Amino acid sequence: MRVSASADHNCPRRCEKKFRWRRPRHTLKGRQIADEIERVGLRLQVRKQQAEAGDIVLLYGDESEALTHPYLARVWAKAGADLRVPAPGQAKKVAMLGSLDPVTRQLIVHTSPTKRSSDFVAHLEQLDRLYGPKPGQPAKPVVLVEDNGPIHTSKLSLAALAARAHWLTVEWLPKSAPELNDVEVVWHDLKAHHLAHQTFADTDALDQAIHQAVDALNTERMVLPLARPRISAMKIGREQWAVTRPRPFVGG
């Protein structure tokens, strides 16, 4: 496929033929194995049914990160408004290692300066406290869905998973199959609806904001389990509204 990069997107001939000025998207075509995705997708459907029946706890695991510079999301604003959000200095990041329970819709997050195997093990220890077997208490088997990323398949991580094999089973996702991981959408919700358009002084402030955002997200999803997340509201003016996205502003 060849995509024209010409900037002449106002050409009348193209408008007459219903052309639109659009940006191409990346595709995972050629990197995915269709049969494997279908097979694992069917297995996960069965796992969801088991979780909904109360037979197991199903968790979708993944990693993401947040920046001290503002995450920019689309908002309602007056048409033509030039939205700017201060973004001073060099951006620093905080890694988020999380697991989503699709039945209770609760997100569990461990924050760290890095995304390493030791950080993944720290998140497993977090799951130990929540779902691991405890003396005198019944415990459900836990199924953790993960991709084959290096921090999950390292020697340290595999040893940590093996030590929990009596109560935790891993469902490995196929290569390049983010559409099978339910937590992917929740990362977007967390950033776009709870962390957007904010500038953080340092990583400590960002870390605190992440945990507050997770608490707010979990409360919202528990109170309104069928409601879609709210759009962040940055309103300017009173009429001629349009959905737009702010830009970072590095001026004084």
How should each PLM-predicted stretch be described?
Residues 9, 54-56, 183-252:
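C-terminal anion-handling pockets and recognition modules
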